[in-house]
C-alpha cells in the first residue's frame, strides 16, 4: 500500500522511540530516568520544516482495496472514495493568525464547527464526542477528539461517520487537522476503518497531549 504526505511526496523517516534505560542504584535516580524517558518520547514527535513549513501533516494512503484516490479542490485535503458512496478524507489547515493558547478549547471549537456543518446539510443527526488516541505519530498516540455521527443525507440514505479532529495552538506552525470516514450505514465497516487507520499517520507533531 502506498502513502503520501499532504505537504510533500516521498519517504519521510522518523526517529525511533528509545524505551531503554540503564539500571539505577537509587529510587530518586530511577524517577529521574523515568522522567527523561517520558521527555524523550515527546521529543521524538519531531518537526520537519520542509513539510508544510513545520505544520502538522498527514501521511495518507493513495491505495486501498475497493477505494480510489482523488485530490479535493481544497488546499491541504486528500480523499479516497468507493462505489458505495463512502468517503475517507484528511484535511489540514494553518491558522491565519496565532490563536489563543489552548489545544483542547480550539479542538472543541473545530469539532463544533464540523457538527454544525453536517447538521446544516442533513437531517436527524445524532452524535457523540470523546477523547481518542487511535491516531499516531512516530509510533506514539496523539490525543484527539473523536465524533461518531449518524444522519440522513440529502439523498435520503442513512449514513454513519467518524471524524477525528485536533488543533495545535502552539509550536512551529499552529493549525488544525481532521480525518473523516463516512459511508452509508449499510456499508460501514469497523474492520475496513481499522485497516485504513493503520496506513494513516500524523507527522510534525510537537505535542501529543490535548492540553487545556
Question: Can you describe what each PLM-predicted range is?
Answer:
Residues 80-84, 147-150, 168-171:
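Active-site beta-strand termini and strand-to-loop segments that position acidic
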Residues 81-109:
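A short acidic-to-branched-hydrophobic micro-motif
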Residues 92, 174-184:
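Short, well-ordered beta-strand elements
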Residues 97-105, 131, 182-187:
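Second-shell loop/turn segments in exported
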Residues 100-125:
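Short, solvent-exposed recognition patches
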Residues 116-167:
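Signature of long, low-cysteine stretches enriched in small and polar/charged residues
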